[in-house]
Amino acid sequence: MGIEGVLKEGFITTSADKLINWSKTGSLWPMTFGLACCAVEMMHAGAARYDIDRFGMLFRPSPRQSDLMIVAGTLCNKMAPALRRVYDQMAEPRWVLSMGSCANGGGYYHYSYSVVRGCDRIVPVDVYVPGCPPTAEALLYGILQLQAKIRRENTIAR
């Protein structure tokens, strides 16, 4: 059924899963957890050239108001409990995007005693964005991949 059928018939048919997942993908509110230089690229994604707002995203300062955590940068052992605490404060459904080599696996500091070798050891990660630092385009691509993953989820159990 095309748009002509919608205008003529006056209604749209879809499944509840598709409708719910569409609304989730169009209103992701990320909470920034910028730990190092990757956070600068995250700021570029929010600026006028890349305009992350066009995806319905609005950066939130509080974990209680957000459903996406973008971990950007080197995660040290002292910061790991704070990352977990912030993740636990986020409401369900929640997603985590790991941005950059340091957040993905420790990066250049992988063998340091004070660095966590990947934020996936602390919180479950949904999408990894590689690079050192990854560009704003790579972050936007990772967000698009997360939106595709959300669209494939089954919200209502069958």
UniProtKB/Swiss-Prot annotation:
Q: What class of enzyme is it?
A: translocase
Q: Name one GO biological process term.
A: electron transport coupled proton transport
Gene that produces this protein: nuoB
Q: How does it assemble?
A: NDH-1 is composed of 14 different subunits. Subunits NuoB, C, D, E, F, and G constitute the peripheral sector of the complex.
Report the locations given in the UniProt record: Cell inner membrane
Q: Which organism is it from?
A: Methylibium petroleiphilum (strain ATCC BAA-1232 / LMG 22953 / PM1)
Q: What does this protein do?
A: NDH-1 shuttles electrons from NADH, via FMN and iron-sulfur (Fe-S) centers, to quinones in the respiratory chain. Couples the redox reaction to proton translocation (for every two electrons transferred, four hydrogen ions are translocated across the cytoplasmic membrane), and thus conserves the redox energy in a proton gradient.
Q: Record-annotated residues binding [4Fe-4S] cluster?
A: 37-38, 102, 132
Q: Which reaction does it catalyse?
A: a quinone + NADH + 5 H(+)(in) = a quinol + NAD(+) + 4 H(+)(out)
A GO cellular component annotation here is: plasma membrane
Q: What is this protein called?
A: NADH-quinone oxidoreductase subunit B
